[in-house]
From Swiss-Prot:
Keywords: Aminotransferase, Arginine metabolism, Pyridoxal phosphate, Transferase. The lineage of its organism: Bacteria, Pseudomonadati, Pseudomonadota, Gammaproteobacteria, Enterobacterales. This is Succinylornithine transaminase. It is an enzyme of class 2 (transferase). Belongs to the class-III pyridoxal-phosphate-dependent aminotransferase family. AstC subfamily. InterPro entries: Ac/SucOrn_transaminase_bac, AcOrn/SuccOrn_fam, Aminotrans_3, Aminotrans_3_PPA_site, Class-III_PLP-dep_AT, PyrdxlP-dep_Trfase, PyrdxlP-dep_Trfase_major, PyrdxlP-dep_Trfase_small. SUPFAM superfamilies: PLP-dependent transferases. GO terms for molecular function: identical protein binding; pyridoxal phosphate binding; succinylornithine transaminase activity. It comes from Escherichia fergusonii (strain ATCC 35469 / DSM 13698 / CCUG 18766 / IAM 14443 / JCM 21226 / LMG 7866 / NBRC 102419 / NCTC 12128 / CDC 0568-73).
Length: 406
């Protein structure tokens, strides 16, 4: 008989880089999860914007099981049908001409930055290596991507960091313009800063970055790891803004919970990559590709994308009602189903405490820094689940302002 598993086992056995909740989920269906004790939670965290179709979606299970009964992996010495079908779906749905598959958002961003450096070196010379990113950004945890992310708390322990990366103020075109010049090979930006507080870019900011990149022969990289695959009510957020990047990274929701990432590129950009310039053992795995292909089939429809915008209104209307009662938030912001509630000055730094109260009340939410409570639910979350979950969130807010649950 196997040994019972408890939350304490995490503290005994795992590298202490996370501080997970005190309960362990064991089963999910749609936007509901149940823990080891049978307690139900409405899931508005979505695995950090990953579970775009909720838990255990029947068509995703079917796609996974069908491929699992055939073969699981061959390595990049061979291609496979699911990955080629997935590549064609992404190309047909976006600006891209070529796709590189990997396993995560960090890997996709790493590939994008490497491609941008090689593109600049091949076309203009090795002096053109500068990367401009933005303060409070998040692009992953590899040494290259954590350096591009503009949050020193994540990178300061790992010096020396890769050179030639500079950070401008987000949504400040003058700040970016002061850093972008003819030595810049790429600008990497999130259309909405997710980990940085759910801060949407302005249209003028992204349009201005496109113009600056064109002027200085730099590639514009959109990190759509969190905003992509329907999250904003468009398949990718660049469509919402009407600004087309040269490279786009996608992951998280692309696999609906199965690990997969991708770099989308124009033909011109992709042409500098040749056999051996980059690679990954698991990228384009047929299991991941089969699931991701079904995710795209289900999400890239007018009904689903219009529904995301409708669900945004459900959330914002109810969150504003809750805020009117308890006065916790200075702003409710975001696009589609990436929503941030910004704590007012009286409650600054206490987002984590609110998320903990929410879990006690039976609803899972995220934070984005110390001052923002973040919602990233499934794109198909039902109106009943939204109502029930936000009823529970209201209970959590009441407990928080009254000093916490007993």
């Amino acid at each position: 008989m196997s040994q019972p598993i408890t939350r304490e086992n995490f503290d005994e056995w795992m590298l202490p880089v996370y501080a997970p909740a005190p309960f362990i989920p064991v089963r999910g269906e749609g936007s509901r999860l149940w823990d080891q004790q049978g307690k139900e939670y409405i899931d508005f965290a979505g695995g950090i914007a990953v579970n775009a179709l909720g838990h255990a979606h029947p068509e995703l299970r079917e796609a996974l099981n069908e491929q699992a009964s055939k073969f699981w992996h061959t390595g990049n010495g061979y291609t496979n049908e699911p990955v080629l079908r997935l590549a064609k779906k992404l190309i047909d749905a976006t600006f891209a001409d070529r796709v590189f598959f990997c396993n995560s958002g960090a890997e996709a961003n790493e590939a994008a930055l490497k491609l941008a450096r090689k593109f600049a070196h091949d076309r203009y010379g090795s002096h053109k290596s500068g990367i401009v990113a933005f303060k409070n950004a998040f692009h992953g945890r590899t040494l290259f991507t954590v350096s591009a992310g503009g949050q020193p708390a994540y990178s300061q322990d790992f010096a020396p960091l890769p050179p030639d990366i500079r950070h401008a103020a987000y949504n400040d075109l003058n700040s970016a313009s002061a850093l972008i010049d003819d030595s810049t090979c790429a600008v990497i930006v999130e259309p909405i800063q997710g980990e940085g507080g759910v801060v949407p870019a302005s249209n003028a900011f992204l349009q201005g970055l496109r113009e600056l990149c064109d002027r200085h022969n730099a590639l514009l990289i959109f990190d759509e790891v969190q905003t992509g695959v329907g999250r904003t009510g468009e398949l990718y957020a660049y469509m919402h803004y009407g600004v087309t990047p040269d490279l786009l990274t996608t992951a998280k929701a692309l696999g609906g919970g199965f690990p997969v990432g991708a770099l989308l590129a124009t033909e011109e950009c992709a042409s500098v990559m040749t056999v051996g310039t980059h690679g990954t053992t698991y990228g384009g795995n047929p299991l991941a590709s089969a699931v991701a292909g079904k995710v795209l089939d289900l999400i890239n429809t007018p009904e689903m994308l219009i529904g995301v915008k409708q669900r945004h209104d459900w959330f914002v209307e109810r969150l504003n009602t809750i805020n009117h009662r308890y006065g916790l938030f200075s702003e409710v912001r975001g696009l589609g189903l990436l929503i941030g509630c910004v704590l007012n000055a009286d409650y600054a730094g206490q987002a984590k405490q609110i998320s903990q109260e929410a879990a006690k009340a039976g609803v899972m939410v995220l934070i984005a820094g110390g001052n923002v409570v973040r919602f990233a639910p499934a794109l198909n979350v039902s109106e009943e689940e939204v109502t029930t979950g936000l009823d529970r969130f209201a209970v959590a807010c009441e407990r928080f302002v009254s000093g916490g649950s007993s």
